[in-house]
Amino acid sequence: MEYKKLHSWKLIPEKAIELQKLLSKKLTFKPLSKEINLVAGVDLSFVKDYGLAVIVILDKNMELIKVYHHIEKITFPYIPGLLAFREGPIFLKAWKKVNHNVDVVFFDGHGISHPRSMGIASHMGLWIEQPTIGIAKKILFGNYVEPENKKFSFTYITYKNQKIGIVLRSRENVKPIFISPGNLITLDESLELTKQFITKYKLPEPTRLAHKYSQLLKKQFNEELQ
C-alpha cells in the first residue's frame, strides 16, 4: 500500500519532540465512513540491532488472510515517547508490501494516550491516511480508575478532563488493556471495534496474531544470525 511521506526520519530527539507537537495538530477524529471488511494488526519487535515489523490481515470474521513482514537494521535509539521514530520506518517498509485494502489498522502500542498525542498508532495513521487504533498492555500517559472485574467493563483514560483513551477489561481476572484512537476514528468506535475482535484471549485478534507471528519470525531470524 502507498503512503504519504510526511517528514524525514533523520532527526535528533529534540527535533523529533518538536515534530510530534506539530503533527498532533493534524490528527482527525471522525466516525468511520464505510463498513469494516478487512482489518490489519501490527506488531514490532527487535532482534539484536534489527527491527521486525509484522502486519497481519484479517477479515471481519477474524479469519487470517495474509501475513506480511519486513526486517532491517534500527537507526534510532530507544527513547520512551519517541518509539515511532524507531519503529515507524520499519513498519512503512512492511506496509509498502501490503496489497489488501484494509479498513482499520490495529497497532500494538498507543494512539493519542501519549504525552504529545503521538503514539505509534497516531503517527503512522497520518502517514498511511487510514483509521488506526492503539492497543497496549500498559498505560503510557494519563489517569484512570481500574474497571470492574467483569468482561467488557471499562473506564476512561483522562488528561486535563479530556478523554484520551479507554481501559478495557477484555477478560475476567486478567489485567485490562489500554485502547486509544490513532487517527480518523472516534474513541467510541475504537472501543466497539476492539470488542468485536476479542475472542477468548486478552488481546483483540489483530494484535494478538501479529504478536504471534512476530515471535515466530523473530525466532527464525535469530537462528539465522547465529
From Swiss-Prot:
The record marks 78 as: Interaction with target DNA. GO terms for cellular component: cytoplasm. It comes from Thermosipho melanesiensis (strain DSM 12029 / CIP 104789 / BI429). The keyword Zinc does not apply. Belongs to the endonuclease V family. Pfam families: Endonuclease_5 (PF04493). Mg(2+) binds at residues 43, 108. This is Endonuclease V.
